[in-house]
Amino acid sequence: MKAKFKILIPEPKSKFIRVKCRQCNNEQVIFSNATFPVRCLSCGAQIVIPKGGKAKIEGDTVRILG
């Protein structure tokens, strides 16, 4: 019989993501479970669309932080 291992310190499934805007190539840090639409700081294009749980990322993912 195999022993089940418990996760001693649970980690969150949400992360911070560095995203590049497709229109102006501006890089911006966003939250993966964003609840509000995120717009690019330089051109104003919408980068993230909230979908209830995980947000839909419209830009290009550069790097996952943390």
Curated annotation (Swiss-Prot):
Give start-end ranges for the coiled-coil region(s): none
Keyword presence, Zinc:
yes
Zinc finger (C4-type) in chain = 21-43
InterPro entries documented for this protein: Ribosomal_eS27, Ribosomal_eS27_Zn-bd_dom_sf, Ribosomal_zn-bd
> Could you say which residues bind Zn(2+) here?
C21, C24, C40, C43
**Which prosthetic group or cofactor does it need?**
Zn(2+)
Gene Ontology process terms (BP):
translation
Would the keyword Zinc-finger turn up in this protein's UniProt record? Answer: yes
Cross-referenced Pfam families, in alphabetical order? Ribosomal_S27e (PF01667)
Q: How is this protein annotated for GO cellular component?
A: ribonucleoprotein complex; ribosome
- Keyword set for this entry? Metal-binding, Ribonucleoprotein, Ribosomal protein, Zinc, Zinc-finger
Any one GO molecular function term:
zinc ion binding
What does the entry's cofactor note say about binding and number? Binds 1 zinc ion per subunit.
Q: Which family does it belong to?
A: Belongs to the eukaryotic ribosomal protein eS27 family.
Q: Report quaternary structure and partners.
A: Part of the 30S ribosomal subunit.
Q: What is the name of the protein in this document?
A: Small ribosomal subunit protein eS27
The lineage is: Archaea, Thermoproteota, Thermoprotei, Sulfolobales, Sulfolobaceae
